[in-house]
From Swiss-Prot:
Gene Ontology CC annotation, any one: transporter complex
Family according to the record: Belongs to the LptD family.
Protein encoded by which gene: lptD
Name of this protein: LPS-assembly protein LptD
Compositionally biased intervals (Low complexity): 65-79
Length: 935
């Protein structure tokens, strides 16, 4: 129990515990034990203590090692030199072993002594962790000026005239959450000040400061520790200083201090600065005149640095990054983060590029109870003139971006994804540090409003595209698109009534000017006389128009525990109002005359109505079985799907948003082989399939296998523009390819996924893939991916000829300089691995090869060193880069090579090599999961 001092004596609230009474004026100057007295607050505000029992003489005060001896002799001088404490500056960034061989004075606990819970929070390559010992008052949040002070010691002496108490032997003082420990202490009552000597430790809320001597202000908690070492347990941070000052607000200031996240026995890296400030309240630190030292060797200097000491956000400079490339030359990025409020922030990315100048980029992020999003922008006055003569290039380069998701209420949702750029080469020449901004051929400029009712969904969508390439044709914009889809809220007689409705306006502004390459010459690679690729679009495919589609349906689902049967009737009606330019009208007449079976004619108003009838059915069987000594429940799930869609001539309808889907097991049970609304495939087929699964008692699905085939009773006449079904063997075949899917999960770490489609007519593989993935759940550092894919039935639009290509397809036509046979055919393997070879060393590799064109798409190899406080990656990489210097896709495919170095100082962030993260994340499956769980 502790006694609190009277209000007018609060300035020095020392309390008596079961240890020693320190500050009561005593009649004698010799040492007495606190247990021998009963103490009460006197009327004068002091302590009134009376002995319980007679006082016995206590043994003399012990003499501690390192105590001062009389000077004046050589022996005394030698002893003084020998007993001089080792300075922290002599440790060169390591912990002082003179204080403890095992660094236990820093609360360091070796890995083998950690509990299971502590190991789970410790990095796999860390030799231990800083564990704060449990002590009284750790969670005390009482303000210092209201907290009593508890003191324990073995012996004490009080000098009444000087009002000085001397404590010796395991001295412990505690006030609130703060605790001070020492071998000896002098407490000055009049000044509320204490002097601590020998093995000094000051603890407070996850921090520890260790030193030889300390001055402490007892009423505020301010302290100065000489020859200090410090630890911040949760952040794995330690360091040292000639002296460390702890303020009343718990801020730690270090003179000639160091900062590192390395283990006590390692000096792999450290920050060394004249003045270092660590603020646990904000989670950040600052330092001036700072050198970054590796193995105590200075490698980098900055007059000022602002760095995190935990995972909280705070305004300040983020770690800079620098790199070099042929496009930019030397590049330096010095991000500055603005922590404006808990729910919004901003980041500025000044990017200096030796070949291009200074690019200013920034982003603003926000979060509200019902929405989230970000604004971003960038600007560069580009001084590089490599593209100055190329069409569409602008030297005043900019980018703006807005991403938003939110809800105006629980039913009404809003969405914005808008990016605009100055020229189509922006992302090819420049990078972006903004989160969520991706480089792609066409950038979204989309806004949507969605309302979700109880049985329906209504959506207003405006979706345009901004071209980030000149090697693709201009796509259609939806300006706007309105949809209403739902079901009737009641089911009379068990019937389900559903509906799909859409009204959309499709527009695009086709370009018809000439194109010049970067040398100022006409680009003859993809069009006649240097014309745009848009000039290759022919006939009614050049039309703009409005589309109205209504598709009500009625179904009668019958379900039971052993199976299901669902007949369904759907009626699709579509109305088009079209506009076509003069070139399109002339092309349409010529094409329709030359090949009336593949091309249609132009009509400003076109309609189409198609009934769709289907019957979907399936059964469910299961049994208990065993496999390789394990018990399973095996299922057998046969499925039969009949589809009838009569033929409707649709050659007069342009393609606004429609393509043909690739064949797979799932496609056997779809009611349309086309995506989008502009084509509804005629069908009279019966699809048969069966799936079997092996399920363990705990619900884990060990493996599954599916096989199926469709039987056709009529040829499929509806095709994409320019394709005559009589030239496609697969459109006239009586059966589809066999579709197989097999997945095996060895456990939760290993999995194998495959699909295989075999054509019985040609007795050849139509498509297939196999992918093996290994990543242990308890050790995600190990990754192995091995895959192969083959596809000989791709369907693609060739922008150089303005025609659709099926069955692989060539690029261009024979005789053209850019002609490539089977350009769209896919035959590739992909292998990637991240694997530990010895402790802390991992090998990283990837090889992606295109057998169709006998070329390597990407190859990289290197190593990673990872320990408790820093990480290094060195990777040699070759890849196919795409840079639009012409309109012909193959001409823009250039092999590139680079050696990439990444250094991460844990606790500071990446120093160099941030680009390494992006290509590892995109190229190696499982890499992101690995990094998310990394220490």
């Amino acid at each position: 129990m502790a006694l609190k001092s009277p209000a007018f004596r609060r300035k020095f609230p020392l309390l008596v515990t079961g240890g020693l009474l320190a500050l009561q004026p005593l009649a004698t100057s010799y040492v007495v034990a606190a247990e021998q007295f009963d103490c009460q607050v006197s009327a004068a505000g002091g302590w009134d203590c009376k002995p319980k029992t007679p006082v016995n003489n206590l043994p003399p005060r012990p003499v501690h090692e390192g105590a001062a001896v009389s000077s004046g002799t050589e022996a005394a001088g030698e002893a003084e030199t020998a007993d001089r404490p080792v300075l922290v500056t002599e440790a060169k960034g390591r912990g002082l072993k003179s204080r403890s061989e095992d660094y236990s004075h820093l609360d360091w606990v070796p890995r083998e002594k950690l509990t299971a819970a502590q190991l789970a929070e410790t990095g796999p390559y860390c030799g231990g962790a800083y564990i704060e010992p449990t002590r009284p008052g750790m969670a005390d949040t009482t303000p210092k000026d209201e907290s009593p002070t508890y003191i324990n010691a073995k012996v004490s002496k009080y000098q009444q005239e000087q009002q000085v108490a001397t404590l010796a032997g395991d001295v412990v003082m505690r006030q609130g959450s703060m605790q001070a420990e020492a071998d000896e202490a002098n407490l000055y009552q009049a000044e509320n000040r204490g002097e601590l000597k020998g093995n000094v430790k000051i603890r407070d809320n996850g921090s520890l400061v260790v030193g030889d001597e300390a001055q402490i202000q007892l009423d505020t908690g301010e302290a100065q520790v000489d020859n200090a070492e410090y630890v911040m347990h949760k952040s794995h941070i330690r360091g040292s200083a000639l002296y460390a000052k702890r303020g009343e607000n718990a801020i730690i200031r270090l003179k000639d201090g160091t900062y590192t996240t390395c283990e006590p026995g390692s000096n792999a890296w450290q920050l060394k600065g004249n003045n270092i400030t660590l603020n646990p309240a904000t989670g950040f630190g600052t330092a001036t005149n700072v050198t970054l030292r590796v193995k105590d060797f200075p490698v980098f200097y900055t007059p000022y640095i602002y760095f995190p000491i935990d995972d909280r956000r705070q305004s300040g400079f983020l770690p800079p990054s620098f790199s070099t490339s042929s496009d930019t030359g030397f590049m330096l990025v010095t991000p500055y983060y603005f922590n404006l409020a808990p729910n919004y922030d901003a980041t500025l990315y000044p990017r200096y590029m030796a070949k291009r100048g200074l690019l200013m980029e920034g982003e603003f992020r926000y979060l509200t109870p019902s929405s989230e999003g970000q604004f971003g922008g960038a600007y560069l006055n580009d001084k590089n003139d490599d593209r100055k003569d190329q069409t569409d290039y602008k030297d005043q380069r900019w980018m703006v971006n807005w991403q938003h998701k939110g809800g105006l209420d629980e039913r009404l949702m809003t969405e914005v994804d808008y990016t605009d750029i100055s020229d189509p080469f922006y992302f090819q020449d420049l990078e972006s540090d903004q989160i969520g901004v991706e480089s792609r051929d066409f950038l979204n400029q989309q806004g949507a409003l969605t309302y979700r009712g109880d049985s329906y969904t209504a959506r207003l969508n405006v979706h345009a595209y901004e071209a980030a390439t000149i090697s693709q044709i201009t796509p259609y914009d939806r300006l706007p698109q309105i949809t209403l889809n739902g079901v009737l809220p009641y089911q009379p007689g068990g019937l389900n009534f559903a509906y799909e409705t859409e009204a959309a306006r499709f527009e695009r502004d086709l370009k018809n000017d000439t194109v010049f390459d970067k040398d100022g010459n006409l680009d003859l690679t993809a069009g006649p006389d240097g014309r745009r690729l848009d000039e290759n679009i022919q006939g009614i495919e050049r039309a703009n128009g409005t589309r109205l589609n209504v598709a009500p349906s009625i179904s009668y689902p019958m379900t039971a525990s052993y199976g299901f049967l669902t007949p369904k009737l759907k009626y699709a009606y579509t109305q088009y109002d079209l506009d076509l330019d003069s070139k399109g009208k002339a092309d349409a007449i010529a094409l329709q005359t030359a090949n009336p079976d593949a091309y249609g004619s132009y009509d400003s108003s076109v309609s189409r109505d198609v009934p769709i009838f289907s019957v979907d059915s399936g059964l469910y069987f299961d049994r208990n079985t065993s496999l390789f000594g394990n018990n399973y429940r095996q299922t057998l799930e046969p499925r039969m799907f009949y589809l009838y869609v009569p033929y409707k001539d649709q050659k007069d309808i342009p393609l606004f948003d429609t393509g043909e889907t690739l064949f797979s097991y799932d496609s056997l049970f779809r009611d349309n082989r086309f995506s989008g609304t502009d084509r509804i495939g005629d069908e009279n087929k019966l699809s048969l399939g069966v799936t079997t699964r092996w399920i363990e008692d705990n619900g884990f699905e060990r493996q599954n296998f599916s096989i199926g085939q469709a039987y056709y009773f009529k040829d499929r006449k509806v095709q994409l523009p320019g394709i005559d079904y009589r030239t496609r063997k697969d459109a006239q075949s009586d059966v589809s390819p066999y579709a197989l899917v097999y997945n095996y999960y060895f456990n939760r770490d290993w999995r194998f996924n495959s699909d295989f489609n075999w054509d019985p007519d040609s007795r050849s593989t139509r498509s297939g893939s196999a992918m093996f993935h290994y990543q242990p759940e308890d050790n995600p550092n190990k990754i192995v991916n091995l895959g192969y894919r083959y596809r000989n039935d791709t369907i693609a639009y060739d922008s150089t000829t303005g025609t659709w290509k099926v069955g692989g397809g060539d690029y261009g036509t024979p005789g053209d300089p850019n002609y490539i046979k089977d350009y769209y055919k896919i035959q590739q393997h992909d292998f990637s691995v991240i694997w530990p070879i010895v402790p802390q060393w991992n090998v990283i590799a990837r090889w992606q090869h295109d057998y169709n064109r006998n070329r390597t798409l990407e190859a990289m190899g290197g190593f990673e060193y990872d320990n408790c406080c820093w990480k290094l990656r060195l990777i040699n990489r070759y890849w196919i880069d795409y840079d639009d210097f012409s309109q012909a896709l193959p001409q823009n495919e250039k092999g590139d090579h680079g050696v990439f170095l990444q250094i991460v100082l844990k606790g500071l962030g990446g120093v160099v090599g941030n680009k390494v993260e992006s290509f590892l994340d995109q190229g190696i499956q499982g890499y992101r999961e690995r990094e998310d769980q990394a220490y």
